[in-house]
């Protein structure tokens, strides 16, 4: 639906994003803004309007950044165009945040007035300050009886180091004070700079694939303007496309026919090639190809790798297409084909963390209707061979033989943890159990900020969940990869009836290997259904077996028909049964259920 375009003077535009920790009320505040500026009628309002993915609404988290254009009339009578981007708060999606910030001049830092500052808000806030944005702190959830605005203002100033004495307070749930937030925002956040008469220069912030429209790109116009019918040039591919539709989200898809410097909106040019408009690229018009490219985004490196395999082999091609479509929308996803003896053909995929992996797998299963099995996730290890070559190992099957390896190194993550003083002991114990080395500790009011260096393999598995449970949910975490470090690593193979099952192998530290081997073997014993013969499950490092358990055979009572009778007769029947089981074992194969593959992921420490 096209509508007459309100041409807004560039000095009346405000581009900002909302950054906050998980559950501090970003999406709710966004809902209030939309309601107050009349973006949607009351009947269309629903909680978390911008979290359009079913999965986002279910889990109550924001995964994708979403943009909205609203018109707000300030008490001074001026009408302002607000373009705002709702960003994710979870540590796995921090790259989404840095992309959104590139399109803005300011950021609202939403802090829960009861919980105070958390690690993720600190990390995202620093990203914003580094990119030169104006950061406006806002205290949310002021209606809660346990809200302590003075303490939290003090925390913001002490931990993040930005002025917060005049920070607006509001309650996004009830709508109290939200009007004040909008006023302050217009006064504090600077207007974008840009020349509308200059040649077009626009940055692609995000793109996604629509089966009918092709690639839809979310862009921020730096200079010039783009109209429907223009011939646009994508700088990195050098290809030109005719623009078929231009507009904004308010939050509904609204065509405006033109976007001018300073604005954020969408551009559709019927690009059917999935990689036709990469995120972070620059768009200009085909008549001005000499326009410089804008600095893009740094490529994020996957931290966790896992194999994903379709349960039905005929789904392999649809699975490849689904991954490609997801990859436009989720630039951190990496994949390459892989085959496994146990699971057939599939892809080795790289993710940012365990939550990211779960989300991707669920999106593939829901949006593309696939049934998938995943193998155990591993981080990337570095091996130096005796010849001096460096190899990167992202799967246990690629682990080279011990005889050729000079040195094995594992990735180390620097973890910044913010935790209230009373839980400090528990958190320290957890970090040390995870082979962490303490680097720094600062006391900030009631909170303690500690820095540990912990092997990435320990962090990505379930560290976040454990951290939350040992601190009753108060500790928060932000981590980043710093270096590779030599370590005593081994590959633990799982053998079922003497045959290696490649999808169950794992790489771990030598000190943990025995313990994890025993735990895994015991868990597998419960999950593999009983067969007609004994099934031996073993864990081994090289040729040395470190753990074993047996799934006992089911057997018929062959003596049921001998009432009394001769003992030699009974022995003969039992011997005959034993012989049969032995023959069966030679030819029988064991079906391993999907749960058994998942057991590897959940082996307790």
From Swiss-Prot:
GTP binds at residues 23-28, 140-143. Gene3D superfamilies: 3.30.70.240, Elongation factor 4, C-terminal domain, Elongation Factor G (Translational Gtpase), domain 3, P-loop containing nucleotide triphosphate hydrolases, Translation factors. It catalyses: GTP + H2O = GDP + phosphate + H(+). It comes from the Bacteria. SUPFAM superfamilies: EF-G C-terminal domain-like, P-loop containing nucleoside triphosphate hydrolases. GO terms for biological process: positive regulation of translation. It is an enzyme of class 3 (hydrolase). Pfam families: EFG_C (PF00679), GTP_EFTU (PF00009), GTP_EFTU_D2 (PF03144), LepA_C (PF06421). Its main location: membrane. It is a peripheral membrane protein. Keywords: Cell inner membrane, Cell membrane, GTP-binding, Hydrolase, Membrane, Nucleotide-binding, Protein biosynthesis. One of its GO terms (cellular component) is plasma membrane. It is found in: Cell inner membrane. One of its GO terms (molecular function) is GTPase activity. Its EC number is 3.6.5.n1. Residues 11-193 form the tr-type G domain. Belongs to the TRAFAC class translation factor GTPase superfamily. Classic translation factor GTPase family. LepA subfamily. Required for accurate and efficient protein synthesis under certain stress conditions. May act as a fidelity factor of the translation reaction, by catalyzing a one-codon backward translocation of tRNAs on improperly translocated ribosomes. Back-translocation proceeds from a post-translocation (POST) complex to a pre-translocation (PRE) complex, thus giving elongation factor G a second chance to translocate the tRNAs correctly. Binds to ribosomes in a GTP-dependent manner. This is Elongation factor 4. The gene is lepA.
